[in-house]
Amino acid sequence: MPGPSTLRWLAAGVYAAIGAVAAVDPARVPAVFGGTAGTPESRTEIRAVYAGIPIAFAVALAPLRGRGTAENGGMLRAVRDASAGMAIARLAGAAAERRLRLWPTGGFAALEVGLAAAAHQAARTG
């Protein structure tokens, strides 16, 4: 198993990539799920949520010097819980719709579980 710093950087990189794509090409986010972002307001909303939150997670996950152990642990647990919550909500939504495709819903749920696991392991060992 990679060390806590590696896990943090890996998860931070994934969240930074998600945020960057949403910031630069917000129409791509709903397109993955068969939707559109046809208005400036919808694209702004996508940037706020699908870029802003992942970028905040990436910053929180980056192992920066000067943060105390409690602060680091708290940030890791918050990102872990948010990632797990997204996976649970995604799977609950699929159950409510009685439809779970491997892509994109299953793929994103698996990614969120993996990110939650990485943050959990980093918090335990770091």
Positions of PLM-derived features:
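Short amphipathic, positively biased membrane-proximal segments
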Residues: M1-G126
